[in-house]
Each structure stands twice: as structure tokens, then as C-alpha cells.
Amino acid sequence: MNATLETNQLRQLDQQHHLHPFTDFRDYAQNGGRIVSRAEHIYIFDSDGNKIQDAMSGLWCCSLGYSQDGIKQAVADQLMELPFYNNFFKCSNQPAVELASRLTSMAPAHFNKVFFTNSGSEANDTQIKFVHRYFQLLGKPEKRLIISRKNAYHGSTIAAGSLGGMSAMHEQTQGLNYIHHIEQPHWFELGGDMSSDEFGLWAANELAKKIDELGEDKVAAFIAEPIQGAGGVIIPPDTYWPAVQKILDERDILFISDEVI
């Protein structure tokens, strides 16, 4: 079978049976998509023979490239020894223990626990549970509201999609009513005549205003990407984060850093 025929058959099967996320299905039904067949170093190769630099690193998760022999061997060895076992009911395994220890050794001292998840969406769903349980244990169950930002991306589940600030995702399902959004710190789009430093303080004050509107006794956390990736790789002004941290500290509100890039 020649490569073109095989690619056409794969595209047809893909169109018939494979439901893709974040896809224009009308366009896909008419024109098909790309079949990625292999990868090497920082490049992917499609079934038409095109070599493409993978600037997205898979989906941000292959930043070490595709040709690390040590990683491949470690995966193969682990599949032979113990492909999977859960960590419920006080169970663990050597790789999980060693990885948790290594991660905490590289983090600031107060980051001393690791909870493993399968995706960013799952991680942020879990963050909501952690935040709510934290304030329940402190005797403040009324602190449940979470503030996020417009144009943010925090995942695609109902909870993570609600945390995100992309309106197209909110049109697909009803969001969670305890999640609220403020303006993003996008100086180039929203700064107007303000300097970068002035805009950073203005954007941080949007958080303070929202907390005052909702009631600091009801707001549990603020979630944000240090750099907004999917929103356009938006880097806040230097004045933004120190002002945000001060606002949160003064009001007993947690900060969830959704850091990917």
C-alpha cells in the first residue's frame, strides 16, 4: 500500500470514528486533518512525509523532545516491572516516592507535598477541592468563591472550564456559580495611555475591587497563570504580581498558580 493511499484511508477512518477536541468539524469533514506518524528530537513527521518543528512540545508536555533514550528506557523498564498500581489506601510505589521527594527538593521549603494527576484539568479540579476543604477545616466554610481572569485557560472539564475565562468554552455548558472573573493583565490590549507599571497596578486593583464586591469573607482563592499561555502568552507588568500577592495576603485569600510555561 502506498503512503498516499494509506494516509487517505487513515483520514477517512479518523473522520468517521475519532472525536477531536477544539476542532472545526465542518472544515474537518471537508478537508480532513494531519496524521502524525512519528517524532524525532523536536520534530514531528506526518504521513505525507512533512517534517514539522513541534513548537508546542506535544501539548506543552514533551519539552525534552522525542529522542531521549534515557526516558524511553525508563518507560520500558517500568512497564516490565510495574505498569500501574493505585496510591489509594496507603499504597505507594518506588517511582512515585522518589519523584515526589525530588520535586519537593527543588521547590521552596513550604512546598513539601505532591499530589499527582493525569492532566492540568484534573489538577485544577483538585485545586478547587483542596481550597474548599482547607477553609472547611479552618471553620470558614463560607469561603468558597474563586476568582479567575478573562481569557485564562485552566482546562476543559466543567470545573476547569469554568475557571477559565474564554467565553466560547462557557457557551458549551453552564459554569459553576462560585467562580468569578476579572480583567486580564494585558497591557498591549488594555493599557491605553497608562505606563506598564501603572497598568500593572490597575489590573491588580481589579482583583481588589472584585473581592470587595463579593466579600472577602466569602472569597477563598484567586487562580491565575503566571504567563497566560493559550490567551496569547501574556506577560503581566512587573508591578502586577507583587500587588496581587499583597492584596491576597491582606484578605486571607489563597493563590493558585497554574504554571505551565
Where in this protein do the model-derived segments appear?
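Active-site-adjacent loop/helix segments that line or gate small-molecule/cofactor pockets in enzymes
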Residues: 2-39, 81, 95, 199, ...
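Alpha-helical transmembrane segments of integral membrane proteins
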Residues: 228-230
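Catalytic PLP-binding core of fold-type I/II PLP enzymes
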Residues: 234-261
